[in-house]
Structure formats: structure tokens, C-alpha cells
């Protein structure tokens, strides 16, 4: 008999029902559960899949470059970045009639195209790319890297090239390699690219391989570096009248600390960015030489952790046992990596709009909105994943003997205190915030808006003032003209910062009021509740008073049968599942807030946000309803327009989202009966009965149906908001 899917589980392969397919897909990446898995093979599989991941990333970015070079308008966009709409790629659709062809033929194209709202044009322009040939070259190079990654992944699965377990567990060497080799060297290389290619490019000098060694990035070359006169590299920066991409108003500095934004491009100074990457490179190159490898010098991670005795003995045995616990658990390591990456991704969202690094991206409002929303959603999924793998660690890898009385064990010991405090914070935030919103709603409804409860966010305003925002009149630190910090700031460090903070044309420290105070606390409610569910799921993953033997049932189980009441919905997987709904909900509020605040800022009517955001009806009517009008108008009696694709996606997103509830609410028996009826009818229908199943059709398990429901809910939710966001922003600002 031929080997049936899944090959990694003979038990599943012999299952006579369709469960074989679904469980096979569900456990395909759970290497630990596969037949004949050893620790060595587990690490080698993970290592090889990393190369596969890299290959996919390189292929994807190569595709972006290739399609823009082939079907885009990069060269004409470069000549006029503020007025030419960047094209992502062409559209070929046999359904398009003449009105559709006309509606989607934009940006100087000959036929229908998609407009790029990803910011790649601004990114490539900023780093020195100027022609389609440059884009093709980049696409080919990334294609080559993709192939190299695939070969490397295959190679490391061959017997001769398989790394050993000890190699994977050599934490110090890996730290040194990642810190110095990846972060340090790549940051240094990026500084080199910025100084040698991007900065000359911004000054009208086209540097490529043919003239790379002839064009000096700085008139004095390496002289100042070797003579210690590093300040020369900061002298004569670009002037405020500099036209990006030309020599007009250009300086000669390569590493500066100007602060603020380039007046024409509204983005950070390239010379500041180069300086930043050089500093990062230096820090990481040093950090990557701190840990002890085969040379016998430097820190040992284990010694560091063991030596750390908490003051006053308040934390038991501190970090003893942690080194081996973390180093022997891929789930713990993945949890830490995901937590870090999730936070970084959210920080990217926050900083890409407030401190834009790419030329002219700040004036492309739809791109700004799309990138913020994109990075916040990605961050949400990554962060929830961190807790999921933390819970799996507690179930599969945690050893109570090894961690006696250390910080990890003590977390588990006082989990009731942690969970109840989080619960209290969530309840407090929820009831008070909702109470204020609803009170204000009622006052508006009764025609007495002056009776609203409006709270000024004075602490946040004070913090903004301390950073130099003068409009609140706090007169403190950087907003006080008498303070030493203010005076030093005018000359020594970041002279452009204070101008940028107090200019109302950017997104640095936006003016905040009672509406911001309320939505801030609504978001805090969402964050605390999501955290509560995730933390409880992880801390109760091994067991609870209700179910002390929970860890024996694994990460995802529906219930312990009918004889044991109350054991449904309490697996660690169920906590993750519930938390994802809250995560999506919270990011919904975050993106609504960001988008509405910015739409009113860009349109010059900030009072609309300030007045309408203090009560729920304001959000529903003046943000959601008012801004969905363009969407609902995508198709009308006069034909169609370029927003019609978003109108369709808006409807389709709602459909996918609503489909999710079909899986989330109906139970298993209902589907089993329906499937059996359909199978009966199928087998008795001419032509249809020529096709038979090899597997007996059975309904999804409870956990699987929840996953399918959650996937539809998430995808539909994000599709719907993406269509709303892009249509409402591009409909207003082009």
C-alpha cells in the first residue's frame, strides 16, 4: 500500500475518516509529535525550515521589485514624487468592461493598474534607487539569495552537513554570532550603503559599481576618521532649502545629529539615519564579543544567571536553573523571540508615522494609514503567539525539580495574585471608561452637551511638554526657554527637534484632549483584558484547582468527557483562542483612533475629532458611518469608479467575517448529521455518484471548528477594515 498522508504519523495515516486530512494539516509543523522524532532531528528540521522561510521572504521582495520595474512607473514617480501616483502592478481581468478599464487606468499607465500603498517607492527612492534597471538588478540579486537559502536548507538536512545538538545548544556562540555577525555587521554594512550610495544619491550623485571607488562620500575621505577629527563629518549638513535628489542646497556632512525633518521631504535627515546605524553597529559589535566561547574569555550565560542573587532573598533562588530550562526548550526560546518581535513590530508602527524615515512618505496619507494598521495587526498576532508557546513550554518542557523556588516557579506559585490583579485592573478600566462614554452619550442625546464629563489628560500633556511641546503652557524642561536642556538643545544636540515638535504639519506629539483620554483608557482596557486571558492561559496550563492534572491532556483538548463537569473550554489553547478576539478588538480601537485623529489632522478640521470622540455615537456616526460613504458609493447608478474594488472587498470581508460565526456557534453533532445527509444524497445522484470518498466524511473536532471559525473571523475583520481604511483615505486625498 502506498504511503498515505501524513507520513509523519502512521496512526493518523491509518485513520479511515477525513479526520486524517485535517489532523494531518494541523500537526504538520508540530515536529515534536511526529513518529520517530529525536531531539537531534527536531533541531535540524527547525534549522532547515528557517532557510525555507528566508527563501520565501527573498522571493516575495524580489517579486515586489520585479513587478514595479516591469509594470510600474518608478522613473516618472522619481521625477515628481508628490503628484505621480505610484503603481504596484498591472491588473488583467477579463470581467472588466470599458467603465472599469477607465476607472483603473491611473498613474500615467496604458491600462488598468493597482496603486501602491506599501511605501516601497519612497523606500527605494530614499536608499538611492533611481531607475527600472536598478529595480531589476535588485530583483535578480534577491532571487539569487532565495536560491542560495533553499540550497542551504537542503544541504543542512544531508547526513554530512547536519549540525549536532550541541551546536544548537551553544548559547554563547549563537549570541555572539547574532549580535555581532547579524545585527552588528549588517548595521555597519547599512551605514556603508547610506554613506556611499544613498546620501550621494540624495545630493544628485548617482553612485553605482562602475564609479563606486571614484566618488568620495566626504570631501576629506577617511582622513578625519584616522586623525580623530570625527566632528568634521558632521560639518556642513544639507541646508533647509535642499531639494532632495539634487545638488541644490546640499551639504557635505555624512554623520549628523540635526534632529527634526528635512523641510521638503518631511522625513528624517539621511545623515542622521546613517549616524544612528553606525552607533547601533558599534554597540552590537561590542555586545557580540562579550560571551565566552572556545577562547575562554568573556561571560558565561549560565554563570551570569546563577550568580544573580536577588537582594533580601525576596525572590527565592532567583535565576538558578533558568539557563538549562530555556536552553533545552524550543518553545521557551520561541516565546521570548515572539514577545520581542511583537513589541518591535508595534514600535515600528508607532515610529513609521511619527518619525518617517523615507522621503515624501509623510505626504502619502493612504500609505501612512496602511502601514500603521498593517504593523499593528502583525504585532498583535505575533504577541499572542508568544503566550501560546509560553503555555506549550509549561505543558511540555517545564521541570518543577529543575526550577525549585526560582523566579519561574514563584510565578506559578502566586498565579492567583497575578490573575486577580489583572482581572481587577480590567474591570476597573472597563466599567469606568464605558461609564464615561455612556454618560456623555446620554447628555448629547438629551441636548445638554455641556454636561459631558470631559477629563484633560494633564499627565500626558506634561510629558509632551517635557519633550518640548509648548502649546500647553506647562513651561517645563524642554518647553521652558530658561532650562539648560533647552539651551543646550539649540546648539549641541538635535537643534531641529524642537521645531519639529511644535510644527503642526507632522505627527510628532499630536495635541491631545478629553477624547484622547477616553480612547486611551478604552485601549488600556483591551490590552489588559487580552493580557489577562493570555497570562491566565499560560499560568493555568499545567493545572488549576478545578483540573489539577490538566497538563496530562496536552495543549488543546475540548473536555475530559461528560463525567467530569466544567472541564470544557479550559485548555491553554482555548485561552489563546479567546485572547485573539480581544486582541483584534483592541487593535480595532487603536486603528480607529489613529485613523480618525489623522484624517481630521490632514483635512484641517481637528475640532471634529475633538468634539465627536467623547461619546460612542460620535465614533459610530462621525468616524465609521461618515467615512464608509465612499465605500458604499463604489457602485452607483452612474457606473463605477476606482473605489469599487474596495466596495466589493468591504462586502466580501463582511461575508468572510460572518461565515466565522457558522463555525463558532453551531456544534459538532449538527454538522455530522448534515454531512451524513449530504453524503447520502451525493451517493444517490447520477454522475455525482461516480466520485466516492476514500475517507468517511466526519465533522471537524470542536477545537478544529473553533480554529476555522477564528481564522474566518480574523481574516474577514482585517479585510473589512483594510478596504474601509484605504478607500476612505484615498477617496479624500487621492
From Swiss-Prot:
Instruction: Give the record's GO CC terms.
Output: chloroplast thylakoid membrane; photosystem I
Cite the entry's keywords alphabetically: 4Fe-4S, Chlorophyll, Chloroplast, Chromophore, Electron transport, Iron, Iron-sulfur, Magnesium, Membrane, Metal-binding, Oxidoreductase, Photosynthesis, Photosystem I, Plastid, Thylakoid, Transmembrane, Transmembrane helix, Transport
Q: Where does chlorophyll a B3 bind?
A: 662, 670
Domain of life, source organism: Eukaryota
**Could you tell me what reaction this enzyme catalyses?**
reduced [plastocyanin] + hnu + oxidized [2Fe-2S]-[ferredoxin] = oxidized [plastocyanin] + reduced [2Fe-2S]-[ferredoxin]
Q: Which GO terms describe its molecular function?
A: 4 iron, 4 sulfur cluster binding; chlorophyll binding; electron transfer activity; magnesium ion binding; oxidoreductase activity
Gene3D superfamilies recorded: Photosystem I PsaA/PsaB
Q: So where does this one cross the membrane?
A: 46-69, 135-158, 175-199, 273-291, 330-353, 369-395, 417-439, 517-535, 575-596, 643-665, 707-727
Q: What is its main location?
A: plastid
Where found in the cell?
Plastid, Chloroplast thylakoid membrane
Q: What is the recorded membrane topology of this protein?
A: Multi-pass membrane protein
Specify which residues bind phylloquinone according to the UniProt entry for this protein.
671
In its UniProt record, which GO terms are filed under biological process? Answer: photosynthesis
Alphabetical list of PANTHER family matching this protein: OUTER MEMBRANE PROTEIN, OMPA-RELATED, PHOTOSYSTEM I P700 CHLOROPHYLL A APOPROTEIN A1-RELATED
The free-text function statement in the UniProt record for this protein reads: PsaA and PsaB bind P700, the primary electron donor of photosystem I (PSI), as well as the electron acceptors A0, A1 and FX. PSI is a plastocyanin-ferredoxin oxidoreductase, converting photonic excitation into a charge separation, which transfers an electron from the donor P700 chlorophyll pair to the spectroscopically characterized acceptors A0, A1, FX, FA and FB in turn. Oxidized P700 is reduced on the lumenal side of the thylakoid membrane by plastocyanin.
Question: What is this protein called in UniProt?
Answer: Photosystem I P700 chlorophyll a apoprotein A2
Native species of this protein?
Platanus occidentalis (Sycamore)
Amino acid at each position: 500500500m502506498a504511503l498515505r498522508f501524513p507520513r509523519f504519523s502512521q496512526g493518523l495515516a491509518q485513520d479511515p475518516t477525513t479526520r486524517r486530512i485535517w489532523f494531518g494539516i494541523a500537526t504538520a509543523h508540530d515536529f515534536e509529535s511526529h513518529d520517530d522524532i529525536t531531539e537531534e532531528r527536531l533541531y535540524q528540521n527547525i534549522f532547515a525550515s528557517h532557510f525555507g522561510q528566508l527563501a520565501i521572504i527573498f522571493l516575495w521582495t524580489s517579486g515586489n521589485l520585479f513587478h514595479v520595474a516591469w509594470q510600474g512607473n518608478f522613473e516618472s514617480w522619481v521625477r515628481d514624487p508628490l503628484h505621480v501616483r505610484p503603481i504596484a502592478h498591472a491588473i488583467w481581468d477579463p470581467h472588466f468592461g470599458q467603465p472599469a478599464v477607465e476607472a483603473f487606468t491611473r498613474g500615467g499607465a496604458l491600462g488598468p493598474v493597482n496603486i501602491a500603498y506599501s511605501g516601497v517607492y519612497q523606500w527605494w527612492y530614499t536608499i538611492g534607487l533611481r531607475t527600472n534597471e536598478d529595480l531589476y538588478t535588485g530583483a535578480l540579486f534577491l532571487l539569487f539569495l532565495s536560491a542560495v537559502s533553499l540550497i542551504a536548507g537542503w544541504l543542512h538536512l544531508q547526513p554530512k552537513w547536519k549540525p549536532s545538538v550541541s551546536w544548537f545548544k551553544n548559547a554563547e556562540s549563537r549570541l555572539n554570532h547574532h549580535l555581532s555577525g547579524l545585527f552588528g555587521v549588517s548595521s555597519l554594512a547599512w551605514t556603508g550603503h547610506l554613506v556611499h550610495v544613498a546620501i550621494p544619491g540624495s545630493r544628485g550623485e548617482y553612485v553605482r559599481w562602475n564609479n563606486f571607488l571614484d566618488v568620495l562620500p566626504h570631501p576629506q575621505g577617511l582622513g578625519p576618521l584616522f586623525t580623530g577629527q570625527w566632528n568634521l563629518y558632521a560639518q556642513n549638513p544639507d541646508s533647509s532649502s535642499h531639494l532632495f535628489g539634487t545638488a541644490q542646497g546640499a551639504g557635505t556632512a555624512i554623520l549628523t545629529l540635526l534632529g527634526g525633518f528635512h523641510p521638503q521631504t518631511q522625513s528624517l535627515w539621511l545623515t542622521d539615519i546613517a549616524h544612528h546605524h553606525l552607533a547601533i553597529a558599534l554597540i552590537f559589535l561590542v555586545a557580540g564579543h562579550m560571551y565566552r566561547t572556545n577562547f575562554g574569555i568573556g561571560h558565561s550565560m549560565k554563570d551570569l544567571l546563577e550568580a544573580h542573587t536577588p537582594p533580601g532573598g525576596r525572590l527565592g533562588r532567583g535565576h538558578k536553573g533558568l539557563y538549562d530550562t530555556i536552553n533545552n526548550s524550543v518553545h521557551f526560546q520561541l516565546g521570548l523571540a515572539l514577545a520581542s518581535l511583537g513589541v518591535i513590530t508595534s514600535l515600528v508602527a508607532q515610529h513609521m508615522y511619527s518619525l518617517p524615515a523615507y522621503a515624501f512618505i509623510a505626504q502619502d496619507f493612504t500609505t501612512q494609514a496602511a502601514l500603521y494598521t498593517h504593523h499593528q495587526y502583525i504585532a498583535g498576532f505575533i504577541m499572542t503567539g508568544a503566550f501560546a508557546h509560553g503555555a506549550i513550554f509549561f505543558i511540555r518542557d517545564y521541570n518543577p525539580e529543575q526550577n525549585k523556588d526560582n523566579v519561574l516557579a514563584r510565578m506559578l506559585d502566586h498565579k492567583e495574585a497575578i490573575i486577580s490583579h489583572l482581572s481587577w485592573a480590567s474591570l476597573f478600566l472597563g466599567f469606568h471608561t464605558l461609564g464615561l462614554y455612556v454618560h456623555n452619550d446620554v447628555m448629547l442625546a438629551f441636548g445638554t452637551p455641556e454636561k459631558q464629563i470631559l477629563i484633560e489628560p494633564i499627565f500626558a500633556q506634561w510629558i509632551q511638554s517635557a519633550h518640548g511641546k509648548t502649546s500647553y503652557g506647562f513651561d517645563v524642561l524642554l518647553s521652558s526657554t530658561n532650562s539648560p536642556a533647552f539651551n543646550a538643545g539649540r546648539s549641541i544636540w538635535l537643534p531641529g527637534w524642537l521645531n519639529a515638535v511644535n510644527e503642526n504639519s507632522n505627527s510628532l506629539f499630536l495635541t491631545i484632549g478629553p477624547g484622547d483620554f477616553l480612547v486611551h483608557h478604552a485601549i488600556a482596557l483591551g490590552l489588559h483584558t487580552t493580557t489577562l486571558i493570555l497570562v491566565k492561559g499560560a499560568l493555568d496550563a499545567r493545572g488549576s484547582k478545578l483540573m489539577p492534572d490538566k497538563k496530562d491532556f496536552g495543549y488543546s483538548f475540548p473536555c475530559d468527557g461528560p463525567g467530569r463537569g466544567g472541564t470544557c473550554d479550559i485548555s491553554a489553547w482555548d485561552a489563546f483562542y479567546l485572547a485573539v478576539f480581544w486582541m483584534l478588538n483592541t487593535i480595532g480601537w487603536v486603528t480607529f483612533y489613529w485613523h480618525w485623529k489623522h484624517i481630521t489632522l490632514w483635512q484641517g478640521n481637528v475640532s471634529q475629532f475633538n468634539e465627536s470622540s467623547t461619546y460612542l455615537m460620535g465614533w459610530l456616526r462621525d468616524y465609521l458611518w461618515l467615512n464608509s460613504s465612499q465605500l458604499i458609493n463604489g457602485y452607483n447608478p452612474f457606473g463605477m469608479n476606482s473605489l469599487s474594488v474596495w466596495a466589493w472587498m468591504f462586502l466580501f470581508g463582511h461575508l468572510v467575517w460572518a461565515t466565522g460565526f457558522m463555525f463558532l456557534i453551531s456544534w459538532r453533532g449538527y454538522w455530522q448529521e448534515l454531512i451524513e445527509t449530504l453524503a447520502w444524497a451525493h451517493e444517490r445522484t447520477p454522475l455525482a455518484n461516480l466520485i466516492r470518498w476514500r475517507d468517511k466524511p466526519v465533522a471537524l473536532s470542536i477545537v478544529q471548528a473553533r480554529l476555522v471559525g477564528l481564522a474566518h473571523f480574523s481574516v474577514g475583520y482585517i479585510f473589512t477594515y483594510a478596504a474601509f481604511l484605504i478607500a476612505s483615505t484615498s477617496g479624500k486625498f487621492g
